[in-house]
Structures are given as structure tokens and as C-alpha cells.
């Protein structure tokens, strides 16, 4: 009988004999409405119920498609399932504490088994249609990629596939499973739909009562019968069309009855499961797990004699599957560990153990097929342990030599000296790279990053072990490579003992990181044959010197190495290290009061506007076609870990303050110079953009503070300038990041006073006839000798036209430079002259070469230009030349007058 009819159905045999007709319902009754419609209450479902119901409905659809092997629809349903699970993730993380529901894991496991079963059946695959074959390949790839995130849950599920938590049974997932099973059992007593549990006997065969089978059938319904039963229930539940679309009434009596039924059924199921468990305690019966059980391959025969050749042969057999398709890499690692344990149990020697250790390391590296992705944490911890264990064995046994130059046929494991093929240096380099990838993968502001960063101690310890081994038996090239790895973990770390040693607070024999860097780098300078290792060692050495305020040593290394000449030909990683070195060198120069050198070091980084990219500390958003996806992926791989970053705001502030201390006095000295050059283009743009604003509020950002300080310095107001640069907000953002920040702030205030004094003298020198040095010292709170030194230097460099009168301690200003009105008039004359020149050139272009021809357009034979002697030719150029000569004469005369006045002033001073 069809399951779509309203009445219940008998067994299949009875339905085949008797034909039951579908009842004819009155069409009018299907649309009848009652007055009780207002009493029907709406059912409010939670988000969890909605999401889980969506997931279970898609899972049922997938099961139906699997039954008929409809692979294209299975693929589309699987994509819907992944999207639905993504939507349900917030609910799962909130309600289930991030634990994936078991019914979802069961669906993934069943889908994986279904795909593997079809894929292994080659004959069946040949008979599939083209569409099914294509969909099968796509589905297999997507499922294999998707279930990587659920490997642990799947492995736990496959260990105990029939055990399900009570909470999932009772609350969310299969609360109606018992009803569906009972209804389907009552409606469809088909032998094909009932799957009795398979029971394997460990004792002689024992007859099972029929009642037990029937009772177990109601529990162990297959998912197929569940889906059919539930669909038939939905059809038979509604007697007309109206009831189907009405919201379910929530009467207390019905709900209470349903709850009681469900509780009774759950109790019955628990009793049956408990009874089965008690029967299993006798040890005679064993429940067979559904699905194909993969047996672990046997390592050796039972009576085999374990010796070195046998273990090595087994090792070669295990490693021969390396890199092949469908190789179980997890099983391969487990087999290698088991082989190592067998080797240790039979005392086959340290060389065999070292060889197995090295192959375990290779197998762990091979587990992650994508090089750009980091390895799993369980494999990372295992890798560190195995690597350190192998290096300890090598250091404890000096007669073992492991090198990649040893051929496999020349390996020796029995008699000393022992020779093994392998390269621990390559392994530790790969280990270091994996550590960097792990750091890049973590959120730098999370606790995971801190916990991962703690592993650096183990990584450095492993590098130290490899370094000790190669110092005993390695060649210079290998030692240079391992030295560079240690340098790269050391060069960016600040050691306060260095500065204490400079001040004499610790004994002079105290070993510091600077001493270690000197030792490692000098060995590389002497022994390295490759330019790359030497270049990176020099850059790291300069960086370390600059970090510890060894300014002159760092500067001399830069100048002697000539790195700035050929750094453009280096690889991207080396160029990034060069940029980092220049940034840190600029900070060092600033701390050592070399403002001009600090500006020169930082200008190349900051003028581009992309210091973040140049230092490999992040990517700036680009336009659509400026950077492809592949380029972006490569640049992300080059990024530096977060703990090695240089503070960009600190870098920009140091650059802008240095530019301010250089640019503001220069602007004041060349105020009326039309051809004035810019020292810092970035700072000049910031200053000009601020001046264009009609209303400027109080400064908030770091840039606004520097611009406000620059405006105060232009007026000679050093106190306002210092308050803008050194205040609570700027201390928190910038200056407190320096080691010995108080000394840096004192240095800044001192420089601001000196440069404000220079700016004041440049700006107001034409106002004063003479000015007292003590009054200047009092105004800028500087010692009198310091003010005297600054003014003397300005006079010597011909920046200030004045002379010092020592008896009276005054500065006598010379009126050699034009007044403000004269300077503006001269600027006006120059601009008008340029404007006239441009206009005359435009006029010449419009007229063409008519007046430049001697015969006025070849019409001289007609008498038009007779007796003119070419007087009209090039008349505009002649007039321009005459005017320019006249202007030059006027300027020369004015200059002569100035020189005469200056000579007269000098004569008066001498008298």
C-alpha cells in the first residue's frame, strides 16, 4: 500500500494481495475554517532548534540520495550542509561549548565511507555516467578537504560509533527517533528494512531468542527506515489541507502526554542497552563495529629474529611509501615509533636509533603536504621532542657521523666508526621555519601567541645542540649556516647587561649578547663563501650594535661594508633585513643626539609612505589590479612575526621630530629664497596642509603634536614647542617606549631650546641692531657659553651676518641683507620678469617664424621689404635681451653698493 495514504498500512505481503483505495475527502472540507482559530497558540522555536532542524533535514536528504547513488544531488546537498553548519556555528559554540554535534560527525563518517566504497569499486565506477563520475571526483575532494577540521572527532566516533551522549539524545538531535522507529516498525514489517545487530561469537554458537531480536530491532533501526517513517507520519498526521498549514497548537495535555511517552521510550532504551552491557560482561559476545575495520599491519613475523638488517629492511619498506598517493601518513609515523621501540628493546645500537629518529623527523615534515600552512600542534611538540632526542644521542656518541655526503651503500651500523646518511642541519632549518609559520598563524594579541612564543626556548636549545655537534665535526660552511640561525634568534633582543657593563655596574668579564654576536659574526666574515650569509650576518650585527647604542661601531660597519651600493641585487628577505637595520640605526642615532644622521637613515623609509610594507610588518590595502592574489600570498609569507616588529608610530615620530629640528631653522634662514629646497618632503607637506586649514583645533594625534610644535618653533617659542613634544600623551605613545626614556626627553628639550634660538635669530635679525647674549641665555634657559658657541658657529658658517663684542657680551647685527620690503620687491621683480618671458615665448609661438625670415616670406622681389636691411627680423628677442641686460646691470649696481656698505662697517669696527 502506498505510504502517502491517510490510513495505516499492513505488511508488504498483505498490501500486495489486497488493493486499498485512497479515501476521497470532501474538497470543501479541505478549506473549512472554524471559530477556534483564535485559540490556536503560536509555537516559538529557539535558534538552536531551527539550526538543528535544518541540519537534520539536509542529512536525511543526503541519506536518501546515497540510497539511490544520486551523486550530483549528494554533492549539492553536501554543499548545503556545510553552509548550514557554518550558520549554526554560533549556536554550537554557545550551547555545546564548541563541541560538534555527534549526529553531524556521524553524517560525515557515513558520507566518507560511502565515497570510499564507491571509489574502491573500480568496476562500478566504470559503469557510472559521465555526470556521476565528475560529481564523484568533486565530492571526494571536497569531503576530504572538509573533514580535516574534524579528524579528532571522527577518530573518536569511529572508536565508539554506537555510543551517543544522553544530552544529544534527549535534547536536540534525535528526540523523535524513538517514535519514528516504533511507527516504522508497526507500519512496515519488512525484512529488508530491519538490520539486526551483527554479533560475533567468541564461544560456541548460541541460539538467540526471537524476542530479543524483535526488541533490539526497535532500537537499531537504520537511518533509511527512520526517514521513510517520519515522512509517512507527516503525511498521515493531517486529515485535510488546512491542518497542514496551521501552526501546531500547544495544549498542555497533549504536550504532557507526548513528554511522558518519550520518557517511557527512553527508559526502555536505557534498560535494553544496560541489559546488553550486562550480557557482554560474560565475555562470550562482542558487538561488531559498523564499517570496514582497518587492521594495523604486523611489524615482524612471530618467530622472526630481530636484528639490524631486518630492522633496516623494515625501515626502508615503511619509508618507500613516502610521497605516494593514498599513503596513511599518521600510520607511517606510528609504525616508525613502534620500530624505534623494537630497536631499543633488542639493543640494536645507537646508530640504528639515530637513523630511525631521522626518518621520524622526515615523516612528521611530510605529514603536512602544503608548505605554506603550519603544522599541527601535536606534530610540532612531537617534532621538538624527537629532534632534541636525536641530537643528544649524536653528542653522546662521538663515533657516529651523520652527513648528507654519505651514500646509502656506504652506511655503517655495526662497527665503529658509524656512518649515517642524513642532514640534521637541514632538519633544524626546517624546524625553525615551521616555528616562524606557527607564530604567523596565531593572533598576535591572543594568549596562543604567547604560549607559542614560549617554544622559542626549545627551538634555540635545539639549535644550540646542532651547533655543538657541528663545532665538533662540521665543515666551515655548515657552521656558518647554523651560526646564522642562532644570530637570527639573537640579533633583535635587547640585553640590559650591555649598558650596565658600559657604566661599570657589572664586572668587565661578564659575557653579554654583544660578545656572542661578535664571535659568531666574525667567524662568518672569515669563513663564509656565499655573499648572502655574510650580508645577513653584517646586517644583524649592525642591528644589534644599534639596539645597544653602539653608534660608532654600527656606523663604521655600514660604511665599510658598502651595503647600500649593492643591496638592490639581494633577495627580498635580505632587503627586508636591510630596511629593519636602517630603521633601528636611525633610532640609535636619535638617542645619541645625532639628529641629522637619524633623519638621513629614516628618510628613505618614510618618504615612500609605505614603511609597513618595507619592514614586512603588514600589507597596505591596494587597488584592484596593483597586486595579484599570488603576489599577496607570497608577501604574506615574508612577513615578520609580531614580536620582532618595530613600532611604526615611534619610527614616524622620530623622523618628524628630526625633520622639524632641521627644517624650521632652514626655513627661517631662507625665508625669501625662491629656490629654497626641502629637507623633508613629508614634513613639509604636513606643515603646509596644516597651514591651509582655516580652523585648527588642539592637537590630538602624534602628527598634529609635531606640526603644532613646529609652528611654535617658527616663532621662537621654545616652551610651547617643548610642551607639544613632551607631554603625557606623547610619553605614553612614543617616548616611554625608549630604554632610559628620561634621558631621551632631556635631550629633546635641549635640542628644542637650541634650534628655537637659531630660528629666533634668523627671523628677527633684521629687527635688532645688537642683542645681549645674557638676555638670550635667560630667554632660552641655556648657559651663556652655550649661547656664545651657537652664535659663533652661525657667524663662521655665514648663516648670520653679525659680529661678537666680547667686552659688552653683545651680538652686533650687520645690515648686509636687504630689509623685508626690499626682499619682497626683489622677489616681485623676479616673478614679473619670468612672467614677461613666458608671455613673449607664447607670442613667438603664435606668430610663427614670419619675422625671422630675412625676405619677409620670399616677397623681396616685389619691393615689399626693400631697403629694410632685415630690421624687423627677431624684434621680440632683441627687446627681451636688452631688458635682461638692463636688469643685470641694476642688480650688479645694487650688489656693489652692499659690498661698499659692508666694507665701511668693517672699517668702523677696526677703528
From Swiss-Prot:
Cysteine disulfide links? none
Record-linked SUPFAM superfamilies:
Winged helix' DNA-binding domain (SSF46785)
Stretches of Basic residues bias are at 885-896
Its BP terms in the Gene Ontology are: formation of cytoplasmic translation initiation complex
Q: Which residues carry this modification: Phosphoserine?
A: 34, 165, 175, 184
Output one GO MF annotation. translation initiation factor activity
Ranges for domain PCI come to: 642-818
**Membrane-crossing residues?**
none
Q: Name one GO cellular component term.
A: eukaryotic translation initiation factor 3 complex
UniProt name for this protein: Eukaryotic translation initiation factor 3 subunit C
Q: Which organism is it from?
A: Drosophila persimilis (Fruit fly)
Amino acid at each position: 500500500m502506498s505510504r502517502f495514504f491517510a490510513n495505516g498500512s499492513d505488511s508488504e505481503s498483505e498490501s500486495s494481495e489486497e488493493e486499498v483505495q485512497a479515501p476521497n475527502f470532501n474538497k470543501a472540507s479541505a478549506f473549512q475554517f472554524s471559530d477556534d482559530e483564535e485559540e490556536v497558540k503560536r509555537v516559538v522555536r529557539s535558534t538552536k532548534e531551527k539550526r538543528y532542524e535544518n541540519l537534520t533535514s539536509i542529512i536525511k536528504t543526503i541519506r536518501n540520495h546515497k540510497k539511490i547513488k544520486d551523486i550530483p544531488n549528494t554533492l549539492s546537498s553536501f554543499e548545503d550542509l556545510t553552509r548550514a553548519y557554518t550558520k549554526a556555528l554560533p549556536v554550537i559554540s554557545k550551547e555545546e561549548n564548541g563541541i560538534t554535534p555527534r549526529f553531524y560527525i556521524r553524517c560525515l563518517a557515513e558520507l566518507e565511507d560511502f565515497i570510499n566504497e564507491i571509489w574502491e569499486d573500480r568496476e562500478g565506477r566504470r559503469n557510472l555516467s559521465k555526470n556521476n563520475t565528475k560529481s564523484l571526483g568533486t565530492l571526494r575532494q571536497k569531503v576530504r578537504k572538509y573533514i580535516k577540521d574534524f579528524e579528532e572527532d571522527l577518530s573518536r566516533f569511529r572508536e565508539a560509533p554506537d555510543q551517543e551522549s544522553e544530552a544529544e539524545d534527549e535534547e536536540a538531535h534525535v528526540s523523535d527517533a524513538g517514535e519514528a522507529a516504533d511507527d516504522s516498525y508497526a507500519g512496515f514489517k519488512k525484512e529488508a528494512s530491519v538490520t539486526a545487530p551483527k554479533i560475533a561469537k567468541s564461544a560456541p554458537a548460541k541460539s538467540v531468542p526471537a524476542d530479543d531480536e524483535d526488541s533490539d530491532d526497535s532500537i537499531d533501526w537504520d537511518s533509511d527506515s527512520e526517514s521513510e517513517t517520519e515522512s509517512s507520519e507527516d503525511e498521515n498526521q493531517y486529515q485535510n489541507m488546512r491542518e497542514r498549514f496551521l501552526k501546531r497548537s500547544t495544549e498542555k495535555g497533549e504536550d504532557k502526554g507526548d513528554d511522558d511517552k518519550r520518557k517511557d521510550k527512553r527508559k526502555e532504551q536505557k534498560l535494553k542497552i544496560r541489559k546488553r552491557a550486562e550480557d557482554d560482561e560474560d565475555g562470550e559476545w562482542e558487538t561488531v563495529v559498523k564499517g570496514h575495520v582497518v587492521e594495523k599491519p604486523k611489524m615482524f613475523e612471530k618467530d622472526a629474529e630481530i636484528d639490524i638488517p631486518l630492522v633496516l629492511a623494515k625501515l626502508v619498506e615503511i619509508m618507500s611509501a613516502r610521497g605516494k598517493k593514498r599513503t596513511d601518513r599518521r600510520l607511517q609515523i606510528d609504525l616508525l615509533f613502534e620500530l624505534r621501540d623494537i630497536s631499543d628493546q633488542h639493543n640494536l645500537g645507537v646508530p640504528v636509533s639515530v637513523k630511525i629518529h631521522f626518518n621520524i623527523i622526515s615523516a612528521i615534515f611530510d605529514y603536512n603536504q602544503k608548505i605554506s600552512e603550519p603544522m599541527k600542534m601535536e606534530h610540532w611538540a612531537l617534532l621538538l621532542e624527537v629532534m632534541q632526542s636525536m641530537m643528544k644521542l649524536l653528542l653522546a656518541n662521538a663515533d657516529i657521523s651523520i652527513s648528507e655526503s654519505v651514500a646509502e651503500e656506504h652506511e655503517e651500523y655495526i662497527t665503529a666508526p658509524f656512518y649515517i646518511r642524513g642532514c640534521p642541519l637541514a632538519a633544524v632549518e626546517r624546524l625553525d621555519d615551521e616555528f616562524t609559520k606557527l607564530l604567523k598563524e596565531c593572533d598576535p594579541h591572543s594568549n596562543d601567541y604567547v604560549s607559542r612564543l614560549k617554544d622559542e626556548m626549545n627551538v634555540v636549545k635545539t639549535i644550540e645542540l646542532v651547533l655543538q655537534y657541528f663545532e665538533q665535526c662540521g665543515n666551515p660552511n655548515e657552521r656558518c649556516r647554523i651560526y646564522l640561525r642562532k644570530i637570527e634568534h639573537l640579533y633583535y633582543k635587547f640585553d640590559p647587561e650591555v649598558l650596565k657593563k658600559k657604566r661599570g655596574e657589572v664586572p668587565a668579564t661578564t659575557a653579554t649578547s654583544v660578545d656572542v654576536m661578535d664571535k659568531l659574526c666574525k667567524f662568518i666574515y672569515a669563513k663564509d663563501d656565499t655573499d648572502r650569509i655574510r650580508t645577513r650576518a653584517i646586517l644583524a650585527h649592525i642591528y644589534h650594535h644599534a639596539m645597544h647604542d653602539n653608534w660608532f661601531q654600527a656606523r663604521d660597519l655600514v660604511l665599510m661594508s658598502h651595503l647600500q651600493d649593492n643591496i638592490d641585487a639581494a633577495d627580498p628577505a635580505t632587503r627586508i633585513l636591510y630596511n629593519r637595520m636602517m630603521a633601528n640605526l636611525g633610532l640609535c642615532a636619535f638617542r645619541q643626539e645625532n639628529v641629522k644622521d637619524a633623519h638621513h637613515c629614516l628618510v628613505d623609509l618614510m618618504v615612500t609612505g609605505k614603511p609597513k610594507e618595507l619592514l614586512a610588518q603588514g600589507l597596505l590595502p591596494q587597488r584592484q589590479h596593483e597586486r595579484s592574489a599570488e603576489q599577496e600570498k607570497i608577501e604574506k609569507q615574508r612577513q615578520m612575526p609580531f614580536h620582532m616588529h618595530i613600532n611604526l608610530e615611534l619610527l614616524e615620530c622620530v623622523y618628524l621630530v628630526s625633520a622639524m629640528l632641521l627644517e624650521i631653522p632652514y626655513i627661517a634662514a631662507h625665508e625669501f629664497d625662491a629656490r629654497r629646497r626641502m629637507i623633508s618632503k613629508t614634513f613639509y607637506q604636513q606643515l603646509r596642509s596644516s597651514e591651509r586649514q582655516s580652523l585648527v583645533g588642539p592637537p590630538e594625534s602624534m602628527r598634529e603634536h609635531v606640526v603644532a610644535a613646529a609652528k611654535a618653533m617658527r616663532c621662537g617659542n621654545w616652551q610651547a614647542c617643548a610642551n607639544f613634544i613632551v607631554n603625557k600623551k606623547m610619553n605614553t605613545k612614543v617616548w616611554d617606549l625608549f630604554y632610559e626614556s628620561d634621558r631621551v626627553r632631556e635631550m629633546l628639550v635641549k635640542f628644542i631650546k637650541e634650534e628655537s634660538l637659531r630660528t629666533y635669530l634668523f627671523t628677527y635679525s633684521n629687527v635688532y641692531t645688537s642683542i645681549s647674549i645674557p638676555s638670550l641665555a635667560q630667554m632660552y634657559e641655556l648657559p651663556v657659553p652655550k649661547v656664545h658657541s651657537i652664535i659663533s658657529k652661525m657667524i663662521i658658517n655665514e648663516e648670520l651676518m653679525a659680529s661678537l663684542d666680547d667686552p659688552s657680551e653683545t651680538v652686533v647685527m650687520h645690515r648686509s641683507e636687504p630689509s623685508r620690503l626690499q626682499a619682497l620687491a626683489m622677489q616681485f621683480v623676479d616673478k614679473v620678469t619670468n612672467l614677461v618671458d613666458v608671455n613673449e615665448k607664447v607670442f613667438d609661438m603664435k606668430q610663427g617664424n614670419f619675422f625671422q625670415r630675412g625676405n619677409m616670406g620670399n616677397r623681396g622681389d616685389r619691393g615689399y621689404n626693400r631697403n629694410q636691411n632685415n630690421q624687423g627680423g627677431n624684434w621680440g628677442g632683441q627687446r627681451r635681451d636688452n631688458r635682461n641686460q638692463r636688469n643685470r646691470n641694476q642688480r650688479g649696481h645694487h650688489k656693489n653698493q652692499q659690498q661698499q656698505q659692508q666694507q665701511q662697517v668693517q672699517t668702523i669696527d677696526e677703528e
